[in-house]
């Protein structure tokens, strides 16, 4: 079953024309990309970052949230949930499938932004980079490689 809708909302080039502001950023941890878990842990301090209509509460612990990919314009449907045991928020639903589809790894970064003009929520990922240092007798060189 596909993890995204077959409908493309917009041409990805048009994303640059939108007035997006970042509401959430996280460097992925091993538990965020774990095969045993299907969730992105969001700090409880980020309550409301996806807008008041998309925020879980003790009465409504799971809220369906559609997000649009900044890279390809596709819609992804997740569930924004509340863990009442510790008050943390999670993005779940098809999170594991999203990680697999995007080949996300520990150290990659997820960025969620909102368009205030129409309330759409946008998601993108940034690949982690590693720095390799090569030392020789006379010089030191620094390389950046994309994972």
Model-predicted regions and their roles:
Residues 1-147:
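Acidic, low-complexity intrinsically disordered regions
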């Amino acid at each position: 079953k596909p993890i995204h809708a077959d409908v493309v909302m917009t041409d990805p080039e048009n994303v640059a024309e939108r007035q997006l502001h970042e509401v959430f950023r996280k460097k992925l941890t091993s538990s965020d990309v774990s095969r045993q878990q299907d969730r992105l842990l969001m700090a409880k301090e980020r309550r409301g970052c996806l807008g008041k209509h998309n925020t879980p509460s003790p009465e409504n612990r799971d809220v369906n949230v559609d997000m649009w990919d900044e890279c390809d314009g596709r819609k992804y449907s997740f569930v924004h949930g509340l863990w009442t045991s510790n008050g943390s928020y999670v993005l779940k639903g098809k999170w594991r499938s999203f990680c697999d589809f995007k080949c996300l790894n520990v150290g990659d970064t997820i960025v969620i932004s909102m368009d205030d003009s129409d309330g759409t929520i946008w998601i993108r990922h940034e690949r982690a980079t590693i720095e390799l240092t090569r030392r020789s007798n006379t010089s030191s060189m620094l390389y950046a490689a994309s994972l």
